[in-house]
């Protein structure tokens, strides 16, 4: 999310107009997921962060699995429209792939404000013939712009699932993330859903404080940790789906053993009444 293009990165082997000399969250996250769209500065930052919390890559992959589970569950609830904000660099099990595997007519809009994600957006636009996908170059901090730009693809008179997967941590408290979420929800009708995952301040707190300290030193983007109570506030006024806001491996796991997967992220799904 919210990447800023810097000087040309050609000297580091990166695409033009993308500065690969400084770690960027999308590429660092890609490294944790086992991807290849990352550069030496990203790998160094990722490894230093993992020194603070060695299970970080497992936690990142658990977040990706949480995305797939929530999208499958929402499709099972009849949701056919998804607005995925802060989508990051495409890997496997992208939102439209999961949704359209269940309902081919699903419509998905991705939004991110990151030149490296934009460079890879083609792989997010491979919709089934019955459905549709679109990609918006837009920042979460501009919810009105996102809603306006999504309207040609999504029918905002019908329920929409708003997906905020590991993105709200880049919105500082003074930027009023709760107001951003509320504005997005105000634009969609009853029966819509909100999906949130967020790194925790109150799971393995000492390790997470050190992790955030390192990431804030090494990356352009700043990271804010939040408690379970703070993450739950994003769902104010919504009906939380069982089991509520929990560690993401504990949200409707595919098998009981998955509950033990290391993760320091809270996650939940709420329905607009």
What is the meaning of each model-derived region?
Residues 1-138, 143-144, 148-156, 185, ...:
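Rossmann-like AdoMet
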Residues 106, 132-133, 160, 192, ...:
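Short, conserved active-site loop motifs that form the nucleotide-linked donor/cofactor pocket
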Residues 143-148, 170-184:
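A short, conserved alpha-helix within the catalytic core of class I
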Residues 160-164, 180-199:
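Conserved beta-strand signature within the Rossmann-like core of class I S-adenosyl-L-methionine
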Residues 167-170, 199-203:
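Short "lid" loop at the C-terminus of a central beta-strand within the Rossmann-like core
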Residues 205-220:
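Short, glycine-/aromatic-enriched active-site segment of Class I SAM-dependent methyltransferases
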Residues 222-245:
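Short alpha-helix
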Residues 244-273:
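Core SAM-dependent methyltransferase catalytic element
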